Amino acid sequence: MDNIIKYLSAKGKYLLTAVLLGSTLAMSAAGGREVKGRVVDPEGNPIPGAVVNLAEQSRIVLTDQDGNFVLKDAGYDDEVNAKCIGFLTNIVTIEDLDTPLVITLEPDNDAYAHLRQVAFAEKPSKFMTESTSMVSGQELQRYPVTVLQNAFNSLLTGVQTYEASSEPGWSDTAMYIRGVRTLNSAARSPLVIVDNVERDISFLDAFPIDNVTVLKDAAATALYGMRGANGVILVTTKRGDAGKTNIEFTQEIGFQTLTGKVENQNSYNIALTRNQVRYLDGREPLYTAEQIEKYRRVSNGETLDGMDRYRYFNTNWFDVLYRETAPVVKTNLQISGGNNRARYYVSFSYLRQEGMWNSEGTKFNDRFTTQHTLNRWNLRSNLDINVNKYLRVGLDLGGRIDNILQPTTRVFDLTTFGAVEADPMRPVYCPNGELYVDGSASNPIYQLGSSGQERNRRRQLYSTLNVNGDLSPITKGLSTNLVISFDAFDVFQSTQTNGVDAYSYDFTNMAVTDVKDFTYTQTRKYQELTNPSANERANSWTINLRYGFRYDRTFGKHHIDANAFVRTYQQRLNVREANTDNGMYSSDRYLSWNGAATYIFDNRYVINGSISRMGNDNFTPDNRWDTFWGVGAAWVASEESFLRNENINLLKLRASYGKAGMSDTGAGRYPYQSTYSSNGGYGFGENSATWIPGYIESAAGNPNNKWEISKMVNVGLDWDFWGKKLYGSFDMFKEWRSDILVDRTTNPAILGITFAKDSYGKVESKGLELTIGHTNKIGKVTYSIEGLLSWNTNKITEMDEPEPAVEWQRKTGKRIFDYASVSSLYEWENRSAIGGWNQYRFVQWASDPNLISTSQQDAI
C-alpha cells in the first residue's frame, strides 16, 4: 500500500504539471481585444455578481454593483455567456467590439435547474436519480443548538439523531440515515464529507455552512466504496462573492434547562415502605406514627418547628445538585468579498457553554470552580483565486480550539450514584453549616465539591488545496481537478485533586434538646487543590488526495457528464500515556479508482452509473479490494409535451440500485491476526526462584474478516405543482445488508480461546419517506408549511446463535432491537424505593405473556 501511495503521489505531480503546462499553452494561443458590457434584468435594473465569460473559456468575470463587466481577449463573433442565480443563462454574440454589450437575463422560475451536491460532483436537481435531502445553512442557523447535527431531525427526511449526552464539550449525538440497518453497533454512523473531504461534522457550527445534502441510497454512495453503506452527509461551506466587503456580526444568548428529572421517592413513602417491610418480616416498625406524620409534613413542603427541623428531612437531591438554567453564548463574525481575480470568505465563532451543576460545590474551595464549562474558538477561511482564464485555485483553512473545564467525577456518577442514590431522609448540611457526610449515605454536593478539576484541550487544524484546470482548448467540456487536504488533531488532558471538610451529627438522638448539644464527627478533611498532573496526550493527522478529469458537454438534445478520478486516504493516530514510554500507534489507509457518467436526452430521460474499486490495508493482502457500483434512471415527465404546463413545474419518476460497503466495523487494526497477552508463567531453577511469565493466544485472528456489504433498491417520485403551492417527494427503499461482523456464539468453550468476530450476519431493511409542503404569498407576506415523514424497519435474517429453549428468545427473524430477554421484562425504578435503593419492578410485557413459560414466570 505504501508503494501505491508513493506512486500516486508521484503521478499526481506529473498530472498537475500537465495541467499547468496546458493552461500556459492555452494562454499563449489566446489573443483579442477588450470588450465592455452590462448585465440587466428585463426592467433594466443592474444585476451585480453575475458571472460572465467567453464561450470555450473558463476564466470568468463578475459584474460590479452597477452590472458592468470587462472581458479581455475577445474577438468578432465570439459568444458571451452571462448567468446569475435566480436568472436564466443568456448567450449573446459580439458583433461590434467598440459598442458595449447589454445582456438581459430573464428570471429563472425553474428552481430545479439549480445545481445540488452529489458524490464528488454537482447536478441540477431536476436530473438527479439519487435519493437525497437538502437543507440550507440559513435554516440551520434558526435552531439554537450547540451540536450541529441535533438540528437534522426536523429538517432532513430520513435522518434520525439521538443525543446520548449533552455535557459541554462532550456532547454525543448518534446519527442514522434510514434507521439502524446493521447488527454491529460500531458500524452504524454515516460518512461525513465537508467540501469533498472526509471530516468530523462536530468541528463545524452553522454559520459558515452554505448547505447540507444527505445521500441516502446505495447508488448515490457507491463512489465512496466501503465507506458509504450507511449513507453520506455532504456539507458545503460558504465562499466569497465579488463585490464590496460584506461584514455580518451575530450575537446569541440563550439558556438551557433539563428536559426532565427523575422523580425520587419522598421521605414519607420511604418511611411507610420500611415499616411495611418490617411488618411482613414479623418485626417491630422502624418509625412511630408521630415520626411518620412528621415525614409526611416535611414531604409536603412544610417547615417543621424546633428541633424537628434538624431531624426530619425530605431532601430533593436533584434540586440541590442542579440549577434551573445554564447560559449559552454564541458569537460570530463573517467577512466576505473580493473581485474578479480573488474572492474570500472568513468566519470566526466563539461559543461558551456552561453545565447544569449548582454552585454549592464551589464555595468549599476558593481556588477553583466545580462548574462544567466549554470555551470554543472556531475559525474558517475560504479563498478562491483565478490565476488565469484556464486555472483556478482554492485554499481553505480552518481551525478549532476547545478548552473544557469539568469536575473529575463524571456526570453519570454524580447523577446515578449521587442524586438518584442519595437518601432523602438525610440533610445536605449539618446545623453548623458544614457538609453532612456519614459512612452509609452519599452527598452529591460533597462529591461535586471534592471532585477536583479536569482540563481538556483539543486543537484541530484543517487545510485543503483545490486546483481546477480548464482543458477546453484541447477538448471542449474537458476539465481537471486536484484536491489535497491535510488535517491535524491534538488533545491534552490534566487533572487536579482536592478534599473538602465534611461532618456527621447524631440527628436521630432524641435526647438532644438544643441544637448546640449535637455531637459532630469529622468524616472528611480539607485538601488544597494539587498541581496539575498530565494524564495522556494524543495526536493524529489525516491526508486526502484526489485527482481526476471531468467531461461535461451538450450535443443538441444530448448531454453527457462524466468524470474519472483516483482517491487516497491515510490517517495516523498516536497516543502516549503521561510520564511513561507507553503508548499506541495506529494507521488507516484507503485507495480507490472511481468513475461516473450521466446521460440526459432532451431534458426528459436520464440514466447514470458509477463504479469504485476500493482497497483497505486493514484486511489480508488477498482480501483487501472490492468493486462497488450504482445505476439509476429518471423520467422527467414534466418536460413531455403532453404534460408541459405552467401549473406543473416538476413531475419526475426515478429509480436506482447499487452496492456500497462499510469497513469501519470496530474490529480494530488487522483483525486477521491473533492477539496475545500475558497469563500465568513458570518458575525455573532451585525452588522455582526464577519466574518466567507466560503468554497465551487471547483471541484468534480471522482471515475472512471483511467489510459489510449493502445492496439497496430505491424508487422515488418528485413533484411541484402551481409554483410550489404543492410540492414534495416520496421514496421507497429496501436494503440487503450482509457480511455483518457478529460474535460466533456456537463455538464450544472447551477450546479455551476467545474467537474473533466473523463477517457472518445478515439484515434486511425497508422503509418509506415523504416530504410534502406548501408555499404561498398573500400580499407582501410569504409563508411555508412543510411536513416530513420517515418510517423504516429491519429484520435479522442470519446470525450465529444457539438453538433457544423457547421460540420467543430467538433473535433471528426479529427486528434488531425487538428480540426479548428476561431482563427486558423489568424496568429500573428510582433508587429510593426501599432503604434508599432502587428495586426492579415487574412490568407488563407488550407481547403475549403466554409466550413466557410457567417455569420462567415462577422463577421471576
Regions found by a protein language model. Give the residues of each.
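Membrane-proximal, glycine/serine-rich, low-complexity loop/turn segments characteristic
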Residues: 20, 24, 30-31, 95, ...
